[in-house]
C-alpha cells in the first residue's frame, strides 16, 4: 500500500513537472503575454489616435465657423459701404426738398408785370437745373394721380367720399413725395376717397 501511495504521489509530481515544463517551453504562452502587452499598447495608441482625430474634427468645425463669420462680416461691410455710397446724398436732398417745394409754389404764381415774367422764367430755369441734378442722384417723384393709396408711399391726411373715385383711390396730392433710388425719403401727403 505504501508502494501504491508512492506511485500516486510520484505520478502527481511527474504531472506537475510536465505541466511546468510545458508552460515554460510553450512559446504560445510567451506570445500571448507579448500579444496582450502589444494589444494594450495598440489600444492605447488607437485611443490616442481617436482622441486626436476628434480634436482635428473639432478644430475643422471651428475653422469653418470662423470662415463663415468672416465671410458674413465682409458681406455686411460691403453692403454697408454700397448703401452709404448709394444714399450719400440723402441728408442733403432732404434739406433741399422744402426749398424745392417753395420753388414750385413760386412758379404757380401768375405774373402781372413783364419784369416779374422774366424773373419767373429765370427761377423756372434754376428749378429745372436743380431738379435734373437731383434726378441724376436718384431722386424720383412719387406718382399719386389716379393711384391707389399705398401706406408705404403715401400719407393720408384727409379722407373724402366722392362717387367719381374708387374706394381707397387718391383724390388729390397735397404735398409731393420723393424716393431716393428705392427708399422713400418723404411720403406724398394725399387726400383719399373713402
Swiss-Prot record:
GO terms for biological process: protein folding. Residues 1-53 are annotated as: Disordered. Keywords: Chaperone, Cytoplasm, Stress response. It is found in: Cytoplasm. Its main location: cytoplasm. It comes from the Bacteria. Participates actively in the response to hyperosmotic and heat shock by preventing the aggregation of stress-denatured proteins, in association with DnaK and GrpE. It is the nucleotide exchange factor for DnaK and may function as a thermosensor. Unfolded proteins bind initially to DnaJ; upon interaction with the DnaJ-bound protein, DnaK hydrolyzes its bound ATP, resulting in the formation of a stable complex. GrpE releases ADP from DnaK; ATP binding to DnaK triggers the release of the substrate protein, thus completing the reaction cycle. Residues 10-44 have a biased composition (Acidic residues). GO terms for cellular component: cytoplasm. Gene3D superfamilies: 3.90.20.20, Head domain of nucleotide exchange factor GrpE (2.30.22.10). NCBIfam families: PRK14140.1. This is Protein GrpE. Belongs to the GrpE family. Pfam families: GrpE (PF01025). It comes from Halalkalibacterium halodurans (strain ATCC BAA-125 / DSM 18197 / FERM 7344 / JCM 9153 / C-125) (Bacillus halodurans). One of its GO terms (molecular function) is adenyl-nucleotide exchange factor activity. Homodimer. The keyword Chaperone applies. CDD domains: GrpE (cd00446). The keyword Cytoplasm applies.
Amino acid at each position: 500500500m505504501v508502494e501504491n501511495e508512492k506511485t500516486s504521489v510520484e505520478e502527481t509530481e511527474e504531472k506537475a513537472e510536465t505541466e511546468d515544463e510545458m508552460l515554460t517551453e510553450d512559446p504560445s504562452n510567451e506570445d500571448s503575454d507579448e500579444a496582450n502587452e502589444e494589444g494594450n499598447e495598440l489600444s492605447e495608441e488607437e485611443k490616442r489616435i481617436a482622441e486626436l482625430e476628434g480634436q482635428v474634427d473639432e478644430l475643422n468645425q471651428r475653422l469653418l465657423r470662423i470662415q463663415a463669420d468672416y465671410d458674413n462680416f465682409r458681406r455686411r461691410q460691403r453692403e454697408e459701404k454700397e448703401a452709404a455710397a448709394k444714399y450719400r446724398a440723402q441728408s442733403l436732398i432732404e434739406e433741399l426738398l422744402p426749398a424745392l417745394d417753395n420753388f414750385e409754389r413760386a412758379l404757380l404764381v401768375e405774373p402781372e408785370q413783364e419784369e416779374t415774367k422774366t424773373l419767373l422764367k429765370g427761377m423756372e430755369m434754376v428749378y429745372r437745373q436743380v431738379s435734373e441734378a437731383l434726378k441724376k442722384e436718384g431722386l424720383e417723384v412719387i406718382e399719386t394721380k389716379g393711384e391707389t393709396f399705398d401706406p408705404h408711399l403715401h400719407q393720408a391726411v384727409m379722407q373724402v367720399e366722392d362717387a367719381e373715385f374708387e374706394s381707397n383711390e387718391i383724390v388729390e396730392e397735397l404735398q409731393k413725395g420723393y424716393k431716393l433710388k428705392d427708399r422713400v425719403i418723404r411720403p406724398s401727403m394725399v387726400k383719399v376717397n373713402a
